[in-house]
């Protein structure tokens, strides 16, 4: 990953610590929570980090169950950014480029996807429970496993 992308992601994280933080809703497919990245200790830490972050104000994390199968949002991640003073924008990021979508038809398509995700995703508490269950299922046999938030 390029340095500017890392810098951009870190800058986005700073939105959480503002005096008036931005409201975020995250939808994560259950399978991404199962995808091993960086080894078992890293994955266990990441799952517990998600649990902790989901408890903070202005952040909602909802898990889309794997049992639902393929759905409209399976094509990749996106950000729908809505502003008080400006029209909404969708941001797409690929390996070597990024794209902003601004036309009403494009925005409506992504709003429909989010509405569908809102209907099928687990609720906030259920999502935290699912993440905890995955951490236990996948990593509980490790000596360094700790279920505490």
Model-identified regions with their sequence ranges:
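Hydrophobic protein-protein interaction segments
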Residues: 1-149
């Amino acid at each position: 990953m390029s340095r500017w992308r890392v810098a951009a992601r870190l800058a986005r994280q700073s939105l959480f610590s503002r005096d008036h933080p931005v409201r975020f809703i995250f939808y994560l497919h259950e399978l991404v929570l199962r995808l091993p990245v960086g080894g078992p200790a890293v994955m266990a830490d990441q799952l517990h980090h998600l649990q902790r972050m989901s408890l903070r104000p202005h952040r909602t994390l909802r898990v889309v169950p794997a049992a639902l199968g393929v759905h409209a949002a399976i094509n990749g991640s996106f950000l729908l950014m809505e502003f008080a003073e400006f029209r909404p924008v969708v941001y797409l990021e690929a390996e070597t480029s990024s794209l902003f979508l601004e036309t009403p038809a494009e925005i409506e398509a992504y709003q429909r996807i989010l509405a569908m995700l809102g209907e099928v995703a687990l609720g906030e508490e259920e999502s935290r429970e699912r993440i905890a269950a995955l951490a236990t299922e996948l990593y509980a046999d490790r000596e360094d496993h700790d279920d505490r938030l």
